[in-house]
Curated annotation (Swiss-Prot):
Cytoplasm as UniProt keyword: yes
Origin species: Alcanivorax borkumensis (strain ATCC 700651 / DSM 11573 / NCIMB 13689 / SK2)
Enzyme class: hydrolase
Residues binding Mn(2+) 2, per UniProt: K260, D265, D283, E344
Enzyme Commission code(s) on record: 3.4.11.1, 3.4.11.10
Signal peptide span: none
Cofactor field: Mn(2+)
Protein name (database record): Probable cytosol aminopeptidase
Gene for this chain: pepA
Length: 489
């Protein structure tokens, strides 16, 4: 999708369609020619459009405009929230994409509480996401959309808007990279495949270097927890390290992203139920969001030093697989009693977290994982859980989520929960019982991040949409992560 901005008089601006947001209590935009405003007014009085929230109506042959049609979008009778505005952008884009329109123009909304820069940046991102399609495996893909370009229009020239749409598009591209990886079937997307994706990114972007540790190398280094998960599969586990140097390394160290990359999760010996097990291909959503964030950072050429680590493995039942009751030694030297092999994400993450701290000395570490079903019970599909040992980091991530509509919610990491992980035989066990499952999983990870500013995002409820024809990866939390990185570049 191509984007542009314009402040040419609307009468001289050629487009197949002009998108206009209208509320029940708002006057018609003065930027529209008087004849067009009168035409819309008559259209409304006739009952064809009442500006109710989410209503979309085509008005053909608008007067005194060099556009074939108007798409009228109702905003209702009260001010739109940011989330409501983004939802309307998504809905309008879907309508445009299913029409004959090739080039559309979007009349920016002076009545919205957010800035024009925000509207263009987040609008471009949502448009990029809304035109996404994944039909790689269909023998007869659906016809491609005609929509190729969207121009944001405002009467006053604003030099920030060009940068805004470029930023929005780059984030949207990153989101769609994450969605592509999540939507791939597990027979094609496995740990070695993800290594190939990383290497391809390294070839595409000069400032990105890639290193891959094999399962054997990881085991030799002492990653006993990671190896315990990976050894049950014919597919070899991989520790994938991508280092982006958009700024010179400093004594402070880089920011690190660490993603859980379980490309398929059967639960291992603690086998999951068969129903919806197909959706366990999405258990690499954390890794997918790391790849997507790296893509965006490279596209924007951000002036930061970033290290991104993906712990990629399959969790499969096998004669070599870890058993409930096994005790393993982690890279940190701490020992873990494995009581449930389906609590494998924290096992691969704990060694990846230790690795990135030992090798790269980051000042901030953020891990991202589809970690617990308990998080879905607590927060549903709207917010990812945000845990952190640093209040400023937590607040920065929550602010980034609010800014982009990719929202999170703060969760406790109180010492009182740590006792649920006590083991009679090892330093800790990998589950904390039936209560507060998302919290105890985060407490487990906190034991491997005591010396660094750290946050954990549990995205089990937000990484994909479950069931039905709308099923698919969402690409979250790429918008939150990339906004945080931009704010701290």
């Amino acid at each position: 999708m191509d984007f542009a901005v314009s402040n040419r008089p609307l009468e001289k601006s050629k487009a197949d369609a002009l998108v206009v947001l209208l509320g029940k209590k708002n006057d018609l935009p003065q930027a529209l020619p008087s004849a067009t405003r009168e035409q819309i007014s008559q259209f409304t009085k006739a009952g064809d459009f009442n500006a109710s929230k989410g209503q979309l109506v085509w008005l053909h042959a608008p007067q005194d405009l060099n556009a074939d049609r108007l798409l009228l979008v109702g905003t209702g009778d009260s001010p739109l929230s940011d989330q409501g505005w983004l939802s309307l952008v998504h809905k309008a884009t879907k309508t445009l994409a299913s029409s004959p329109v090739k080039q559309a123009m979007w009349l920016l909304d002076d009545t919205h509480t957010q800035t024009l820069e925000w509207q263009v940046r987040e609008g471009s991102r949502v448009v990029e996401e809304s035109t996404y399609r994944f039909d790689n495996y269909r023998s007869k893909p659906a016809p491609a959309s005609n929509l190729a370009k969207l121009t944001f229009w405002h009467a006053e020239k604003d030099t920030t808007l060009t940068k805004a749409h470029k930023t929005g598009k780059a984030v949207g591209l990153g989101v769609n990279v994450a969605r592509d990886l999540g939507n791939l079937p597990p027979n094609d997307c496995y740990p070695e495949y993800l290594s190939g994706v990383a290497r391809d990114l390294g070839k595409e972007y000069e400032k990105l270097t890639v290193k891959v540790l094999s399962q054997a190398q990881a085991e030799k280094m002492g990653m006993g927890a990671f190896h315990a998960v990976a050894k049950g599969s014919e597919r070899q586990g991989q520790i994938i390290v991508m280092e982006y140097k958009g700024a010179k390394p400093t004594k402070q160290g880089p920011v690190a992203l660490v993603g859980k990359g379980i490309t398929f999760d059967t639960g291992g010996i603690s086998l999951k139920p068969g129903a919806t097990m197909d959706e366990m291909k999405y258990d690499m959503g954390g890794a997918a969001s790391v790849f997507g964030s790296v893509k965006t950072v490279c596209e924007l050429d951000l002036p930061i030093h970033l290290v991104a680590v993906v712990a990629a493995a399959e969790n499969m039942p096998d004669g070599r697989a870890a058993r409930p009751g096994d005790i393993v030694k982690t890279l940190s030297g701490q020992t873990v009693e494995i009581l449930n092999t389906d609590a494998e994400g924290r096992l691969v993450l704990c060694d990846a977290l230790t690795y990135v701290q030992q090798k790269h000395k980051p000042h901030t570490v953020i891990d991202i994982a589809t970690l617990t079903g308990a998080c879905v019970v607590a927060l549903g599909a709207h917010a990812q859980a945000v845990y952190s040992n640093d209040d400023d980091l937590s607040e920065a991530l929550l602010a980034a989520g609010k800014e982009t509509g990719d929202r999170g919610w703060p969760m406790p990491l109180w010492d009182e929960y740590q006792g649920q992980l006590d083991s009679p035989f090892a330093d800790m066990q990998n589950i904390g019982g039936p209560k507060a499952g998302s919290i105890t999983a985060a407490c487990f990870l906190s034991r491997f991040t005591k010396e660094v500013k750290w946050a954990h995002l549990d995205i089990a409820g937000t990484a994909w949409i479950s069931g039905g024809m709308s099923k698919g990866a969402t690409g979250r939390p790429v918008p939150m992560l990339t906004r945080y990185l931009m704010d701290n570049a």
